[in-house]
């Protein structure tokens, strides 16, 4: 949800990307808060994913090859999506 609000004001053009982030933080009402919530929420999301992987390792879920491979593919897709934005 916060990503949608940030995307309304962000431009990915190389010449205006940094100024659009400054615009979000300075000119948008509570833009700094939306940006911080977005960053912290994303970090918490990945912590939850890593805990889920750790739980799978602890309980031996890696023995179910097909299920584990689907999870690895989903993890890679989530990481690629987060990196690209």
Curated annotation (Swiss-Prot):
One of its GO terms (biological process) is mitochondrial electron transport, ubiquinol to cytochrome c. The chain crosses the membrane at residues 1-8, 32-53, 68-85. InterPro entries: Cyt_b/b6_N, Cytb/b6-like_sf, Di-haem_cyt_TM. One of its GO terms (molecular function) is ubiquinol-cytochrome-c reductase activity. Gene3D superfamilies: Cytochrome Bc1 Complex, Chain C (1.20.810.10). Heme b b566 binds at residue 52. It is found in: Mitochondrion inner membrane. Binds 2 heme b groups non-covalently. It is a multi-pass membrane protein. Its cofactor is heme b. Pfam families: Cytochrome_B. GO terms for cellular component: mitochondrial inner membrane. Keywords: Electron transport, Heme, Iron, Membrane, Metal-binding, Mitochondrion, Mitochondrion inner membrane, Respiratory chain, Transmembrane, Transmembrane helix, Transport, Ubiquinone. It comes from the Eukaryota. Heme b b562 binds at residue 38. Its main location: mitochondrion. SUPFAM superfamilies: Transmembrane di-heme cytochromes (SSF81342). Belongs to the cytochrome b family. Heme 1 (or BL or b562) is low-potential and absorbs at about 562 nm, and heme 2 (or BH or b566) is high-potential and absorbs at about 566 nm. The cytochrome bc1 complex contains 3 respiratory subunits (MT-CYB, CYC1 and UQCRFS1), 2 core proteins (UQCRC1 and UQCRC2) and probably 6 low-molecular weight proteins. Component of the ubiquinol-cytochrome c reductase complex (complex III or cytochrome b-c1 complex) that is part of the mitochondrial respiratory chain. The b-c1 complex mediates electron transfer from ubiquinol to cytochrome c. Contributes to the generation of a proton gradient across the mitochondrial membrane that is then used for ATP synthesis. This is Cytochrome b. The lineage of its organism: Eukaryota, Metazoa, Chordata, Craniata, Vertebrata. The gene is mt-cyb.
